C-alpha cells in the first residue's frame, strides 16, 4: 500500500548535510517527495511511496547523518496523492 508522510525533524539538523543525506536515502528506498530547511532550524519532509519504504525513511530520520543530533521527529500520515516523480530539496 502506498502512503504519504509529512515529517518535521527537530534538533541539530541544519548545517549537517541532513537534506543531502535524506535525498540519498529516499532515492535508495524508492521514495518520492521533498525535504527542506525551515526558518526555525528544523527540517521538514514530505515522503510518498510504498509503506515499508516510507517507514524506513522515517526511521532513518530519527538519527539522520552522523553529524546530526535529532531530538524529536513529528510524523503526520496522510493518504497517498502521487504528486511526485522524484525526490528533491526545496528551498
Curated annotation (Swiss-Prot):
Catalytic site positions: 19, 37
This enzyme's EC code(s): 3.6.1.7
Keyword vocabulary terms for this entry: Hydrolase
Acylphosphatase-like domain boundaries: 4-91
UniProt xrefs under Pfam families: Acylphosphatase
Gene Ontology molecular-function annotations: acylphosphatase activity
Catalytic activity: an acyl phosphate + H2O = a carboxylate + phosphate + H(+)
Family: Belongs to the acylphosphatase family.
Protein name (Swiss-Prot/TrEMBL): Acylphosphatase
Provenance organism: Geobacter sulfurreducens (strain ATCC 51573 / DSM 12127 / PCA)
Lineage of source species: Bacteria, Pseudomonadati, Thermodesulfobacteriota, Desulfuromonadia, Geobacterales
Amino acid at each position: 500500500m502506498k502512503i504519504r508522510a509529512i515529517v518535521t525533524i527537530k534538533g541539530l539538523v541544519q548545517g549537517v548535510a541532513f537534506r543531502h543525506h535524506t535525498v540519498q536515502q529516499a532515492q535508495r528506498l524508492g521514495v518520492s517527495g521533498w525535504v527542506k530547511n525551515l526558518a526555525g532550524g528544523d527540517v521538514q519532509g514530505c515522503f510518498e511511496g510504498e509503506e515499508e519504504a516510507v517507514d524506513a525513511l522515517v526511521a532513518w530520520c530519527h538519527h539522520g547523518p552522523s553529524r546530526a543530533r535529532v531530538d524529536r521527529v513529528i510524523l503526520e500520515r496522510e493518504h497517498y496523492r502521487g504528486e511526485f516523480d522524484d525526490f528533491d530539496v526545496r528551498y
